[in-house]
Amino acid sequence: MERTLLQWRLLPLLALIVALFSFFFASPRSLQGNNKCSLLPHDHYWISSKRIVTPNGLISGSVEVKGGIIVSVVKEVDWHKSQRSRVKVIDYGEAVLMPGLIDVHVHLDDPGRSEWEGFPSGTKAAAAGGITTLVDMPLNSFPSTVSPETLKLKIEAAKNRIHVDVGFWGGLVPDNALNSSALESLLDAGVLGLKSFMCPSGINDFPMTNITHIKEGLSVLAKYKRPLLVHAEIERDLEIEDGSENDPRSYLTYLKTRPTSWEEGAIRNLLSVTENTRIGGSAEGAHLHIVHLSDASSSLDLIKEAKGKGDSVTVETCPHYLAFSAEEIPEGDTRFKCSPPIRDAANREKLWEALMEGDIDMLSSDHSPTKPELKLMSDGNFLKAWGGISSLQFVLPITWSYGKKYGVTLEQVTSWWSDRPSKLAGLHSKGAVTVGKHADLVVWEPEAEFDVDEDHPIHFKHPSISAYLGRRLSGKVVSTFVRGNLVFGEGKHASDACGSLQLATT
């Protein structure tokens, strides 16, 4: 009888021990809670991985997160003596843990054109792709973000509807470019920098700028130490021969309408004023960032020369320029239309070479969706279809999948997608797995393969217009943390949209 009573007394104790063990060392699959912002029930925990990308290299170890901040990063050999209190441990094993991606070039089309994308679907796609912060472009929404009043509309549209952190670029257009007080009021309202087009944007309330507008914009930005992003193409007269080769369903017909000389001419003009951004120059403190570079020849040579002279200039390219080539684009498949255009395979190789050597600074998605009917997929008319590639959810596996043959490393991916974008956008609390930074983290399995099809949930609004449909990719995102909240894990999103607006304050 006494033995039986002892057994009954021990059972609750054993159950408690088992429960505590399960609580402290649970696998990611078992985490559930009542916090609607997060799939985790608490805000203090450790994340362990055999592959953690830190500023000091790749380590096997653990990251402690508390209150949305990284409070310690320790190597595996030091972890047990560093763990002062018993808190939950999430062990991801061989999966890679690295800073969340920061995508500085996204069109979410909200407010005004949310039928193209919208904050909810776009930021869900970002979370599912390991993007923890994105910066929304000032055009394709309506109205365009060119004043404090239009920025306020965008801020209101984003509230309680974003699943990751979001910042905004403002627009540099002729109406505000020569009015320093107008630009200052837009910058004071919180945009992270400005964006302009040197060719028609295709959006009526976002007209193109000339080099005078850009020079004046840089002089204002110098006071704020924020960047100017420029779509660098200048229209020139074209000589296109008549004939069947100019069939609008042929991608080569479209390619001829936007030759490399357009990019080269725009960049040459830009670099005539960026000397002012050098140390001691009249626009010192300003910075020029060339978006979505497509031409890897003369345009890139000009940029390299300007950098060598001390101009404050950076340049990005996009996954679609690194993944595709003009030769492989099927007739009438307007999903591949964008501007600048995807160029030939030799150009693609040069882009990879420049990226690997550091001449191209970073990557961005330039996620630019629209309604499927504007893609004219049934007609296949490249000359009339809306230009833009939908890729937001897949930029990490695309970069990894197509980069493997070039020897891309995890540290390089982190530099291109986290570290350098954080510096460009002035998001200094983000971009690295280090103490004091936001706990913006992505966990992913580089070796895991998947097909971009109906069996793999796609969260941006119009999957049918993505050029990546049917592609097999390597690199599956397992979990995404935004300021400590597990916003995406094991294929599920947290129920509430608790992303934070990233507005400039100084």
From Swiss-Prot:
Pathway: Nitrogen metabolism; (S)-allantoin degradation; allantoate from (S)-allantoin: step 1/1. One of its GO terms (cellular component) is endoplasmic reticulum. One of its GO terms (molecular function) is cobalt ion binding. Zn(2+) 1 binds at H105, H107, K195, D366. Its EC number is 3.5.2.5. Zn(2+) 2 binds at K195, H231, H292. The modification N6-carboxylysine is found at K195. SUPFAM superfamilies: Composite domain of metallo-dependent hydrolases, Metallo-dependent hydrolases. Carboxylation allows a single lysine to coordinate two zinc ions. Its cofactor is Zn(2+). It catalyses: (S)-allantoin + H2O = allantoate + H(+). Binds 2 Zn(2+) ions per subunit. The keyword Translocase does not apply. GO terms for biological process: allantoin catabolic process; cellular response to nitrogen starvation; purine nucleobase catabolic process; ureide catabolic process. Disruption phenotype: No visible phenotype under normal growth conditions, but mutant plants are unable to grow on a medium containing allantoin as the sole nitrogen source, accumulate allantoin and have increased tolerance to drought and osmotic stresses. NCBIfam families: allantoinase. Homotetramer. Catalyzes the conversion of allantoin (5-ureidohydantoin) to allantoate by hydrolytic cleavage of the five-member hydantoin ring. Catalyzes the first step of the ureide allantoin degradation followed by the sequential activity of AAH, UGLYAH and UAH which allows a complete purine breakdown without the intermediate generation of urea. Belongs to the metallo-dependent hydrolases superfamily. Allantoinase family. In Arabidopsis the intermediary metabolite allantoin plays a role in abiotic stress tolerance via activation of abscisic acid (ABA) metabolism. This is Allantoinase. It comes from Arabidopsis thaliana.
